[in-house]
């Protein structure tokens, strides 16, 4: 969610809070404010707008999850030509790439995972109605492993289910790009589920572990970012397959001759090759690399040779001056030397 959208929602919810205080009752707030809030959010599909109006308490959490995904995207690609800073058409709380590239695949997966992560966390913290801790993971004893369920396990199934209904509702068109988007959404959620953690606590006299209770917790989102970045590097090129009498694509297969093997559930998939992202291009969502900082000596993607696409780079020199080697003299003053340092910064032409 961009700052303008978050500020808008914040003002709307502040207004709703005032209505709540004056009239009293959450149902009144929902009745008066849900349609206002949901109509102010750009890019919602009809089903998403209906969900928003029925569950306005969840829409802020969904926005935070989407923003968390975008922030992680920018972190993971901070040193690349494409740095997730500018995307194409507007979506739920952000933008999307028009080209069905591996970058688009990563974007969909990380945002889908972010929304599911945020919903699950909000349930665990008691910040959403209709959900809480995982009730099925309470009191059951695992005799072979010597522990039982206790504490508050994160209800990942609820989080994933709610996020799936909302995020996937945007995919209205029946084409190859929709199949790609839905697959990557599911891959992001699946990877989140596979990386859930088990935490345990011992109970007993003098630090003994007579009994042990365990519960599931969400992974740090940064961990998911690294896993999905690896999936991005190994993304699978796919193509749509149409049934004999159906013009609409029905599933995706790996793009290899004489192969009808489907990608794995946790694979990121793409249908178009990535542009080089060297030049600014609104169609592909590329902001170009002109003016980007680069590393003169690094051989990786952040190195000037790769980052600047062979155009060369500018050198900027800066001088930093500060007080150093300060000593206290009796009595009573401090004497310092003046230190200076020259640094160079390189930016793409």
Swiss-Prot record:
The keyword Lipoprotein applies. Glycans are attached at residues 83, 127, 295. A lipid is attached at residue 206 (O-palmitoleoyl serine). Residues 238-266 are annotated as: Disordered linker. One of its GO terms (cellular component) is glutamatergic synapse. One of its GO terms (biological process) is uterus morphogenesis. Gene3D superfamilies: 3.30.2460.20. Pfam families: wnt. InterPro entries: Wnt, Wnt7, Wnt_C, Wnt_CS. GO terms for molecular function: cytokine activity; frizzled binding. Keywords: Developmental protein, Disulfide bond, Extracellular matrix, Glycoprotein, Lipoprotein, Secreted, Signal, Wnt signaling pathway. Forms a soluble 1:1 complex with AFM; this prevents oligomerization and is required for prolonged biological activity. The complex with AFM may represent the physiological form in body fluids. Interacts with PORCN. Interacts (via intrinsically disordered linker region) with RECK; interaction with RECK confers ligand selectivity for Wnt7 in brain endothelial cells and allows these cells to selectively respond to Wnt7. Interacts with FZD5. Belongs to the Wnt family. This is Protein Wnt-7a. It comes from Macaca fascicularis (Crab-eating macaque). The gene is WNT7A.
């Amino acid at each position: 969610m961009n700052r303008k959208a978050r500020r808008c929602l914040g003002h709307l919810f502040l207004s709703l809070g005032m209505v709540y205080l004056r009239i009293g009752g959450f149902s009144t707030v929902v009745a008066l404010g849900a349609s206002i809030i949901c109509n102010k959010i750009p890019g919602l599909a009809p089903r998403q707008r209906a969900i928003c109006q029925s569950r306005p308490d969840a829409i802020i959490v969904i926005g935070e999850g989407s923003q968390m995904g975008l922030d992680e995207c920018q972190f993971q690609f901070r040193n690349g030509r494409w740095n997730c800073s500018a995307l194409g058409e507007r979506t739920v709380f952000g933008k999307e790439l028009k080209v069905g590239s591996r970058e688009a695949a990563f974007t969909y997966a990380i945002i889908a995972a972010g929304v599911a992560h945020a919903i699950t966390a909000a349930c665990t913290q008691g910040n959403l109605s209709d959900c809480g801790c995982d009730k099925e993971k309470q009191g059951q004893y695992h005799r072979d492993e010597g522990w039982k369920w206790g504490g508050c396990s994160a209800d990942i199934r609820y989080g994933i289910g709610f996020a799936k209904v909302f995020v996937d509702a945007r995919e209205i068109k029946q084409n190859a790009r929709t199949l790609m988007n839905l697959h990557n959404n599911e891959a992001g959620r699946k990877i989140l589920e596979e990386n859930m953690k088990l935490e345990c606590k011992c109970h007993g006299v003098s630090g003994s572990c007579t009994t042990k209770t365990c519960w599931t917790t969400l992974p740090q989102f940064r961990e998911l970012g690294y896993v999905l970045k690896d999936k991005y590097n190994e993304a699978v090129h796919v193509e749509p397959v149409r049934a004999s009498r159906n013009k609409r694509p029905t599933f995706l297969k790996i793009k290899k001759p004489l192969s009808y093997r489907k990608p794995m559930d946790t694979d990121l998939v793409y249908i178009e090759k990535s542009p080089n992202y060297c030049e600014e291009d609104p169609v592909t969502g590329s902001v170009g690399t002109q003016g980007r900082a680069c590393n003169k000596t690094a051989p990786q993607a952040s190195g000037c040779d790769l980052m600047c696409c062979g155009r060369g780079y500018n050198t900027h020199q800066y001088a930093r001056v500060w007080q150093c080697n300060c000593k206290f003299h009796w009595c009573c003053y401090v004497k310092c030397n003046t230190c200076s340092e020259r640094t160079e910064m390189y930016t793409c032409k």
